[in-house]
Design a protein with these regions (language model features):
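Alpha/beta-hydrolase-fold enzymes
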Residues: 1-40, 162, 166, 183-292, ...
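Alpha/beta-hydrolase-fold serine-hydrolase catalytic core, especially in secreted/extracellular enzymes
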Residues: 2-18, 137, 302, 306-308, ...
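Catalytic-loop region of hydrolases
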Residues: 16-94
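Short, surface-exposed "cap/lid" segments of acyl-processing enzymes
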Residues: 58-60, 64-140
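Conserved acidic catalytic loop of the alpha/beta-hydrolase fold
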Residues: 141-143, 152-170
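Gly/Ala-rich beta-loop-alpha elbow adjacent to hydrolase catalytic centers
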Residues: 174-179, 183
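Short beta-strand/loop motif that positions the catalytic acidic residue
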Residues: 331-333, 337
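Small-residue-enriched hydrophobic alpha-helices in membranes
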Residues: 580-756
Length: 756
């Protein structure tokens, strides 16, 4: 080895262990990235202040026109009704039923239902429907109550109906998250105002859940009930800070709250800022509720769980009974939603009904759709969900309204382009509504009697603690909890403080904006294969995993403590729950007025069992054939629509829907007599009966019959219809083929995209 070579070898050996270039590149990037991150935080704070300064802040991506101001009602509230202005180029048909979207008042401001162009509002516009939006102002009207809001929302729907006198149906109503239970309360009190109701990610049965999951339902028990809600309302000088509700959501996922969300921005700071700021505009727009409103929500819903058993009583002494709803109810939830898991969205049916026959006896149509993987917010804001589930609901709203009473699951499968019935499918998916039973609901998870008793113990303890608070503590809190103190408490809230800290008023951040401009002009991003960058990424994943593990461990601890405390026989006996082994919650009975209505309806259907002509006979026959398969889809509905237009154009869509439901109920009442009456109904109009025979066969060819019972029924019905076909006289010596030629449905407006 020469003297010239010897120095170079140790130097070469040191290079892999001292990657100075990589280190320098990493630290330059980290310094620049830190400045850009601080600049985004400052932009977030500026956006927060600008948003809060608006008289009616919202995050809608559409223009609006004020229709009604709830503050001007006899019982004023801070809710408003606006008409959404359709984007240019979209044709809106005012004769189509309007869609009304109700936004959740759960700590955030309004607008999440129209947060993106591809949203619930967007897909309703694409289907050609007028759209309205019910939002709210950040400050409540002094003294407003939940009952006042229910009355105001009913008044809003009355106005929408009045604005569309020629619409082909009552408004379709969407209630997102916490707006879902409010919409259901309005529908129970004023069922005549509603078309189909879609409740998306909405909790309706608050105790329901699965062991090992759904920890949020235990929170009220560990806090000793709703006395803390009352304390927060008193400290807020009669107003409850919605930021506390948002903090409950954030506590569910400590990994995302304390690390992932901010690290994702830091690691993608060059591209992620617009998306981050867009979401933070809504997430940081905290609002206020009256203390009385929040106390009602906590006592009657979250802890009391009274909505699903008709336990809520209004000031006029009437129960809010969800069985009073006459419109179809569509429940949309997700298995990945840890805020409103499927049991909390669906188990209200188990609370109210013994069986599907009980649902039918109340004339109700309930549909559910369960997503496999989307989170809570994704139900409202995900573009993929909007393009699939919400689009199909909007496109098939008329089929949903014509479905016979019962319980169904909406099953969506990709459209087969090569299928001979592809022209009958309006969107990218074929929607099938498959009959289900309450056992299918139980399969998602439900409480045992022991579980119910534990939550009932929480409700009793909550009442005791609330009484003690109001007797011994509240008189000492209220005198010093003035408006000024309440405002400072809100500013110092852990969720609001980060927005307040990074404002331009902070002297430590005066130069951040100019530094960020300089960095953008001289940006030196690190290479993705940089060793230190990759180590940072691995460290980030490790921190995220650790926080997830902490969250899982915390949830298991919370659950075990809850069951240990409230499962105690001694505690349950002290609060009066051991006096009986029966379930602490009882299914509500049926009042005498409704029993009389049902008796009258049965008498009417029995009397008219042989009434009608070939149209009624064809619908009755189709239902009779298809009932064993338990499936309805949009292809059959389009053909039924075609039948209505071809053979009875004078029959309105509403009358047609009523006819379908009446024929289904007639079959349920006395199936054999109903079928035996078909020949006489066909004889009323022989020529029309002949056309109906062709139509019925075409329907069955398109839809198919899967079960042996259905095939046997088809043979029975075919014999009835074929024996009454009138031979058609040939024109120009050539026989004419009777065949329905369905038109290809247009995407917008989607008047022709009905299902069935």
């Amino acid at each position: 080895m020469t003297s010239q070579e010897s120095p170079s070898k140790p130097q070469a050996a040191l290079v892999p262990f001292f990657p100075w270039k990589d280190a320098w590149s990493y630290w330059v990037d980290a310094s620049q990235r830190g400045v850009l991150f601080l600049d985004v935080m400052q932009q977030r704070s500026e956006q927060y202040e600008e948003h809060a300064a608006k008289p009616a802040p919202h995050v809608l991506k559409f223009g609006t026109e004020l229709v009604m101001d709830g503050r001007k009602l006899a019982r004023p509230v801070n809710y408003i009704l606006v008409r959404i202005v359709a984007p240019k180029g979209l044709e809106i048909n005012d004769k189509k039923r309007p869609f009304v979207i109700f936004d959740p008042r759960a700590g955030h401001g309004p607008g999440i239902g129209g947060f993106k162009a591809q949203s619930e509002i967007g897909v309703a516009f694409q289907a050609g429907h007028p759209c309205y939006f019910v939002g709210f102002l950040p400050e409540p009207v002094s003294g407003q109550t939940i009952e006042d809001i229910v009355m105001a929302e009913a008044a809003f729907l009355e106005r929408v109906i009045a604005l569309h006198p020629e619409a082909d149906g009552k408004p379709a109503v969407i209630g997102n998250c916490q707006a879902g239970w409010a919409v259901m309360m309005v529908a129970a009190k004023r069922p005549e105002l509603f078309g189909p109701i879609i409740v998306a990610g909405s909790p309706l049965s608050y105790w329901a859940g699965v062991h090992g999951e759904n920890p949020m339902r235990y929170t009220g028990g560990l806090l000793g009930g709703t006395w803390l809600t009352a304390l927060m309302g008193d400290i807020g000088a009669g107003k409850f800070d919605g930021a506390w509700l948002v903090s409950n959501f954030e506590n569910l996922n400590p990994a995302n709250t304390y690390w992932t969300k901010q690290y994702n921005l830091y690691s993608k700071v060059d591209t992620e800022a617009p998306r981050y700021l867009e979401f933070e505009k809504w997430w940081g727009g905290h609002i206020l509720l009256n203390a009385e409103e929040m106390q009602f929500i906590a006592d009657e819903l979250f802890i009391g769980n009274k909505l699903s058993t008709a336990g809520i009583v209004t000031s006029d002494g009437q129960s809010v009974d969800l069985r009073s709803i006459r419109s179809p109810i569509i429940v949309f939830c997700s298995k990945a939603d840890n805020i409103t898991p499927p049991p909390q969205a669906l188990d209200w049916m188990l609370d109210l009904y013994d069986s599907v026959e009980d649902i039918r006896a109340h004339g109700q149509t309930i549909i559910y759709a369960v997503h496999e993987s989307i989170g809570h917010l994704g139900i409202f804001v995900s573009g993929s969900v909007a393009k699939k589930e919400h689009d199909e609901f909007a496109s098939n709203i008329d089929l949903i309204e014509v479905l016979p009473p019962g319980l169904y699951e909406a099953v969506m499968t990709p459209k087969e382009e090569g299928s001979p019935t592809a022209d009958l499918v309006g969107g990218d998916y074929l929607v099938r509504f498959e009959a289900r039973t309450l056992d299918d609901i139980r399969a998602f998870g439900c409480n045992s009697v022991d579980d119910e008793r534990k939550f009932a113990a929480v409700a009793r303890i909550s009442e005791i603690n609330l009484g003690l608070y109001r007797t011994f503590v509240q008189p000492w809190v209220k005198p010093w909890a003035n408006a000024g103190f309440a405002e400072w408490m809100r500013k110092l809230h852990p969720l609001r403080l980060p927005y307040e800290m990074f404002t331009p008023a902070n002297p430590l951040l005066k130069s951040v904006s100019s530094m960020a401009d300089y960095v953008r002009e001289n940006r030196q991003p690190v290479s993705p294969d940089n060793a230190l960058w990759q180590a940072q990424h691995r460290m980030g994943k490790a921190i995220e995993s650790s926080l997830k593990a902490y969250g899982d461990m915390r949830d298991r601890f919370v659950e075990s403590v809850f069951h240990a405390v409230y499962g105690s026989p001694v505690l349950q006996a002290v609060v009066g729950l051991k006096a009986s082994d029966a379930s602490p919650r009882h299914r509500p009975g049926v009042d005498a007025v409704y029993r009389a209505f049902v008796a009258h309806r049965i008498e009417e259907l029995t009397r008219n069992i042989a009434q009608g002509g070939p149209r009624e006979a064809a619908i009755r026959a189709l239902l009779y054939i298809r009932i064993p398969d338990g499936v309805a889809d949009e292809r059959g509905f389009r053909l039924l629509e075609h039948m209505r237009e071809e053979t009875g154009g004078e029959l309105s869509l509403a009358a047609f829907k009523a006819m379908v439901r009446d024929q289904f109920l007639t079959l349920l009442l006395d199936e054999r007599r109903a079928i035996e009456a078909i020949p006489a109904m066909l004889d009323a109009e022989p020529e029309l009966a002949s056309r109906m025979a062709v139509t019925l066969r075409k329907l069955i060819e398109v839809l198919g019959v899967e079960s042996k019972v259905g095939k046997a029924r088809f043979a029975e019905i075919a014999a009835m219809f074929e024996s009454r076909k009138v031979p058609k006289a040939p024109k120009n010596g050539a026989p004419k083929e009777d065949r329905i030629q369905p038109a290809r449905p247009a995407r917008a407006p989607a008047a022709s995209r009905n299902l069935s």
